[in-house]
Swiss-Prot record:
Record protein name field: Small acidic protein
Tissue: Expressed in brain, heart, eye, liver, kidney and skeletal muscle.
UniProt-annotated stretches for the region Disordered: 1-160
Basic and acidic residues bias (residue ranges): 46-76, 112-122, 144-160
Superkingdom of this protein's organism: Eukaryota
Family: Belongs to the SMAP family.
Stretches with biased composition (Polar residues): 80-92
Length: 172
């Protein structure tokens, strides 16, 4: 108990809350009512007046009732989109991309990359972006042939050389 008294003597006494309400925003004397409302609004204490009707949920005048046929069609479209996304996720086609058109090849994938890039470029040409894919495929093949000729000593050098070739090819 003596330690409590000593700490109270060192730190002082706590003041009680002001009973006159001086901490209330409503009681602040700011002049006219307009200034008071502006102050309260800026402090986030003002009450906003609702202008218009607030409707929660569907209202008959605003909602659109779908027929069974529309529901079936929408469900089929959603299922097909889901299947497409699951197929692309499970195939792993997008996993090897690091972003911004860069994909890092490992030693075993370099040989298969030539075959798969030809396959991918044929798919992309069907979609209508012939010129862009042809240019990027040529740049990729040029980078691969240059890397094979250089034959770096470590994997780190191989990665840096490939990245540099990618930067040089995309900059021109």
């Amino acid at each position: 108990m003596s330690s409590a008294r000593e700490s109270q003597a060192r730190h002082g006494l706590k003041r009680a809350a002001s009973p006159d309400g001086s901490g209330s925003w409503q009681a602040a004397d700011l002049g006219n009512e307009e200034r008071k409302q502006k102050f309260l609004r800026l402090m986030g204490a003002g009450k906003k007046e609702h202008t218009g009707r607030l409707v929660i949920g569907d209202h008959r005048s605003t909602s659109h009732f779908r027929t069974g046929e529309e529901d079936k069609k929408m469900n089929e479209e959603l299922e097909s989109q889901y299947q497409q996304s699951m197929d692309s996720t499970m195939s792993g086609r997008n996993r090897r991309h690091c972003g911004l058109g860069f994909s890092e090849f490992q030693e075993g994938e370099e040989e298969a990359a030539g075959h798969s890039s030809d396959h991918e470029s044929s798919e992309d040409s069907e979609s209508g972006s012939d010129s862009k894919q042809d240019e990027s495929a040529e740049e990729l093949q040029a980078a691969e042939t240059h890397d094979e000729a250089a034959v770096p000593e470590t994997k780190k050098e191989a990665k840096s050389n490939y990245k540099m070739m990618f930067v040089k090819a995309s900059g021109s």
